[in-house]
Regions:
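N-terminal export/targeting leaders of redox proteins
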Residues: 1-36
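Positions in alpha-helical segments
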Residues: 48-49, 85, 114-117
Length: 140
C-alpha cells in the first residue's frame, strides 16, 4: 500500500510540475534532430549526447516506445511511441540515479515481463550511451 501511495504522489508531483511550466534543462531550440546529432554528439555535453543516443534509431531509439517532454519538439521530428511510459519528471520518479541507470541497463531485473530490452546486459548500446541517456532523462 505504501508503494502505491508513493507512486500516486510521484505521479501527482509530475503533473503539477509539468502544468507549472517546468521544462527540460536544455532551453527551447537546443534539441538537435537525429541528423544534427551526428555533428553535435561528439562535442556536446552529456545531456545532449543522451538525447542523441535516445533518438538515434541505431542506438537507444527510446522514442520508438516512449514519449518525452521536451520543448519545443524538433521540427519535423516524429512524436514518440506509446508502448512504454512517458519520459516525464524522471528525477521525481527516480530520485536515485543508480536506480534509473539500472532500469535502462536491464529493465527485466525489476519486471521480467517488460517489453523494454536490456540495453546494457545485451550490450545493445555502450555504457557511455547509457550514462548519457540517464543524464538526459534526469534533466527532463
Amino acid at each position: 500500500m505504501l508503494k502505491l501511495k508513493t507512486a500516486v504522489v510521484a505521479f501527482g508531483a509530475a503533473i503539477v510540475l509539468a502544468a507549472a511550466g517546468y521544462g527540460p534543462a536544455v532551453q527551447a531550440g537546443d534539441w538537435p534532430t537525429e541528423k544534427q546529432c551526428k555533428k553535435v554528439a561528439k562535442d556536446g555535453d552529456t545531456i545532449i549526447k543522451g538525447w542523441c543516443a535516445a533518438i538515434t534509431r541505431k542506438a537507444g531509439n527510446c522514442l520508438a516506445c516512449h514519449q518525452a517532454m521536451v520543448n519545443p519538439w524538433p521540427e519535423g521530428f516524429p512524436v514518440g511511441g506509446n508502448i512504454g511510459p512517458p519520459l516525464v519528471a524522471m528525477a521525481a520518479r527516480f530520485p536515485n540515479r543508480d536506480d534509473l541507470r539500472a532500469q535502462v541497463w536491464d529493465a527485466t531485473a525489476t519486471n521480467p515481463n517488460t517489453s523494454m530490452p536490456p540495453f546494457g546486459r545485451h550490450k545493445l548500446i555502450s555504457e557511455e550511451d547509457i550514462d548519457n541517456i540517464v543524464d538526459w532523462l534526469l534533466s527532463i
